[in-house]
Regions:
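Amphipathic alpha-helical coiled-coil
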Residues: 1-414
Length: 415
């Protein structure tokens, strides 16, 4: 689906040609079947003994056969053309794959917080806008890389606007890992170890440094030793206790080189597993370094909330939802923004609560008709009415609503 979207925007000529070919081939195949059926019908209804004497029949069969061969040749040529079109389409597969990867980064975010839910329809529209806003280039390879980079940065910035501050680095790390996994840079077992720890029981064994290394850390080092890339780690640790203790005692263990050649043996991602084992407090710093190296500085500092950018993402059918934290009230900021947009006299708000649904629906209908902005506050206080609000939004027909209409919603986090 995303490949079709990318090609439709980047090479509409290919899209049109392929659609035309499909229709043409379908007609040709149907015509071929009709000719074959006609030839069989003529042969079945002709006396075999008079077959060679029926000049009209022979002429008809000859013409039908020639037409059939011509159609078959056209089909062969069409199939070759279709293969060439598909080859050209495949050049954009990398963009579509990145688009798919990005969507699956957010498909399970609701497990982190139920408020983090994103529809496929929203994402496809967003991805299309990213394509439209990517700087043009005459060189195809440059253009494709630009599409991948622009969509990734815009995706990160857009999603970060909808996340609580405490979840932003986690999301950047998830995005980084998904990209690395897609390019074969992360082993699945190593990823599981980093996220969940040892997956099977192993013998505890004697801790070589019980004075400063706790039993849990030693157990994880032994578990790491069972992974192919970490084979020999346990022995190295035992033989180089003093060097490893320097790492353990450092204020930020992620900034030091691991002893006994392990710094060279391991990738930056794999080093996080060692940090998890005996300096878990340094993992966030190590994650930040990985993100910086793999994705770039724009993924380290999450963008500050920008009401103007959020407004640009909205439409008559796409309301904006402010998820509130304790003490936060976006109403004043929105009022200032309305003034900046010369909408002060076209902006109204109301607080939802028991029995307010009918009034809110009426105000919404008026705002849609007049092209006003309506802010419905405290949606969490009208949970029973929200399904009706959802239906009202889904029923909005863009062509029948004033294009200046916007709906703003506020709610406390709710499961």
């Amino acid at each position: 689906q995303l490949l079709a979207l990318v090609v439709a925007k980047e090479r509409p000529d290919l899209d049109e040609e392929k659609s035309s070919l499909v229709i043409k081939n379908s007609k040709s195949k149907r015509r071929l079947l009709e000719i074959q059926a006609k030839m069989l019908g003529l042969l079945e209804n002709t006396d075999p003994n008079k077959l060679l004497d029926d000049l009209e029949l022979i002429k008809t069969l000859t013409e039908s056969n020639q037409t059939s061969q011509s159609i078959q040749q056209q089909l062969v040529e069409s199939e070759e053309t279709e293969r060439n079109i598909d080859e050209s389409r495949q050049k954009y597969r990398g963009v579509a794959c990145r688009g798919s990867l990005l969507f699956f980064c957010i498909s399970n975010l609701f497990q982190v917080d139920p408020m983090y839910q994103y529809s496929l329809a929203w994402y496809i529209n967003f991805f299309g806008i990213c394509i439209d806003n990517t700087p043009a280039s005459d060189d195809l390879e440059t253009r494709i890389q630009s599409l991948i980079d622009t969509s990734t940065v815009n995706f990160y910035n857009n999603i970060c606007r909808s996340l609580f501050e405490r979840h932003k680095q986690m999301f950047a790390f998830l995005l980084c890992c998904r990209i690395m996994q897609g390019e074969g840079e992360i082993d699945a077992r190593e990823y599981r170890f980093l996220i969940t720890g040892p997956s099977r029981l192993i013998e505890q064994g004697e801790n070589p440094a019980p004075q400063w290394l706790n039993s849990k850390s030693w157990y994880e080092i032994k578990a790491l030793n069972t992974l192919p890339s970490f084979d020999g780690l346990q022995e190295s640790f035992t033989k180089n206790i003093s060097e490893w203790k320097e790492i353990f005692d450092a204020s930020d263990a992620s900034k030091l080189q691991f002893p006994d050649g392990w710094d060279r043996k391991l990738t930056q991602f794999q080093k996080l597993l060692i940090l998890r084992a005996f300096r878990p407090d340094s993992v966030p710093s190590g994650i930040q370094d990985l993100i910086l190296k793999r994705l770039g500085p724009q993924f380290i500092e999450a963008p500050q909330f920008d009401l103007s950018s959020s407004f640009d993402d909205s439409s008559v059918t796409t309301p904006l939802l402010f998820v509130l934290s304790v003490g936060a009230d976006p109403a004043s900021d929105l009022a200032k923004f309305a003034e900046k947009k010369s909408f002060s006299k076209k902006f109204s708000s109301m607080s939802l609560g028991q029995g307010q649904g009918e009034i809110a629906a009426k105000k919404m209908a008026e705002a849609m008709d007049r092209g006003h902005w309506l802010m419905l506050q405290n949606c969490h206080l009208a949970v029973s009415w929200l399904p009706e609000l959802e239906v009202l939004i889904e029923k909005i027909k863009p062509d029948e609503v004033n294009r200046d209409f916007r709906l703003w919603l506020t709610s406390m986090p709710s499961p």
